[in-house]
Amino acid sequence: YMKKERKINKIPVVAISTFGHCGIDWLHSLIDSHKEVLILPRLSFFRKIDSLKKKSFYLENTLKPNTIVNIIRNIDFFNDKTTRISRSSRILQKNQNKLTFIKYINNFLAAEKELVCEKRLFFAIHYAYAKINKINLNNIKVIVAHEHAPWNCYQYVKHFNSKFVFVVRDPRALVAGSLRGSLK
C-alpha cells in the first residue's frame, strides 16, 4: 500500500526576508538541509514576477499552462551559461534536465487550474523542484520562500496567508537609516 502524495498547495508557506544586509543567506543555509522543509535556492519569487511585468509579461488566470511555461522561461533561474547567477542560486544543477523541470511545471499547471496564476506558478516551481530532486512531499511540513528584500512580502500574505521570519541587524540603525533615506 502506497500512501497518496500530499498536495503541495496544502503545505503552509513561510517567507524569510531581511532589511538590509543582515545574513539572510546564512539563515537560508541553516534551513536548507532540513528534511521537513522545502526551500529553493534563493529565488525571490515575487521579485522575479515583478521583473516579468517590467518586460511586459503578465500572468493572467486565463493563460494556458504552455503559455505560462513560455513566459517563465524568461526568468533567469535556470543554469544557462547566458545568465550570471551564482552556483548556489541556481534551481537546477548541472546534472538536472531543464526540459524535465519544465515538464513538471507544465503538468502541475495543467492539473491545478483553480488557483490564482501567481500562486499556481509558485507551487508549480516548488513541485517541479521537489520532483527533480526526488523530495517526498509527504515528509514536508513547510515551504520556506526566500525573498531577498521585504518589498514583496505583502504578496505572501495576499496569496498564502504566510508567517514571516525577518532578519534585522540593529532595529535602531534600521529605523534611523530609513528615516534619513526618506528625508532626502
List the model feature ranges, each with a label.
Residues 11:
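Short coil/loop residues immediately preceding or within conserved phosphate-binding loops
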Residues 14-17:
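Short hydrophobic/aromatic beta-strand immediately N-terminal to the Walker A/P-loop
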